[in-house]
Curated annotation (Swiss-Prot):
HAMAP family hit by this protein: RNase_HII_B (MF_00052_B)
MF terms (GO), sorted A to Z: manganese ion binding; RNA binding; RNA-DNA hybrid ribonuclease activity
Species the sequence originates in: Ehrlichia ruminantium (strain Welgevonden)
Protein name: Ribonuclease HII
Gene coding for it: rnhB
GO terms under cellular component: cytoplasm; ribonuclease H2 complex
Binding site for a divalent metal cation: 25-26, 120
Cofactor(s) required, per the database record: Mn(2+); Mg(2+)
Pfam families from the UniProt entry: RNase_HII (PF01351)
Keyword Nuclease: yes
């Protein structure tokens, strides 16, 4: 289970001086449709019941994830950042993800003065704060794991809303990822404005419809 070992180690390096350490994670990197969503999270207290059961969002059932989300959003400082379809297509998915992360951090920094950022992954976006990238960070750091939960619940809700407009793609279940039913629907109905044109399945299907 994630804990605050990394956060506490950073505090030691700072001689235990007050240091606002923010965890960041994203959701939607590999999806064929919908935005990339990033969350930035700061825990004011590392030793309370708020942290119980927090884990990498991918390891939680939707019901458990929602329950933890409801608990933590009132007890931590957090912010969300989006990177939209046109940004994914124009700048590529990695750069768009970094845009979403920067937006989440900028939103949070408007309310607290960020000192240090820990990010899930192996790359650090161009941000004005000292930062550390941690591969598998959402399984190690509670701050990052909480960010993964908030980002996941936020994005899932968005895809469920879009499903109402485009029910044939089953986004309420696949959340825009390239599942068999999603691919089948793409070949049958074509793409929507919410699909990522630069992703191979979409570009292939677009070409097929254009030349049919």
């Amino acid at each position: 289970m994630p804990d605050f070992s990394i956060e506490n180690e950073i505090l030691k390096l700072k001689n235990n001086k007050e240091c606002i350490i923010v965890g960041v994670d994203e959701v939607g990197y590999g999806s064929l449709a919908g935005p990339v969503v990033s969350a930035a999270v700061f825990f004011p207290n590392y030793n309370n019941e708020t942290t119980q059961d927090i884990n990498d969002s991918k390891k939680l059932t939707p019901k458990t994830r929602q329950k933890i989300y409801n608990k933590i959003i009132t007890r931590v400082k957090w912010s969300i950042g989006f990177a939209h379809i046109f940004e994914i297509d124009e700048y590529n998915i990695l750069n768009a993800t970094h845009i979403a992360m920067k937006r989440a951090l900028t939103g949070l920094n408007a309310h607290i003065d960020i000192d240090y950022v820990i990010i899930d992954g192996n790359k650090i976006p161009n941000i004005p704060w000292n930062a550390q990238a941690i591969i598998g960070g959402d399984t190690i750091s509670t701050s990052i794991a909480a960010a993964s939960i908030i980002a996941k619940v936020t994005r899932d809700r968005l895809m469920e809303t879009l499903h109402i407009q485009y029910p044939q793609y089953n986004w309420n279940k696949n959340k825009g990822y390239g599942t068999k039913d999603h691919i089948t629907s793409l070949y049958k109905y074509g793409k929507t404005i919410h699909h990522r044109n630069t992703f191979t399945p979409i570009s292939k299907i677009s070409y097929m419809f254009k030349n049919s």
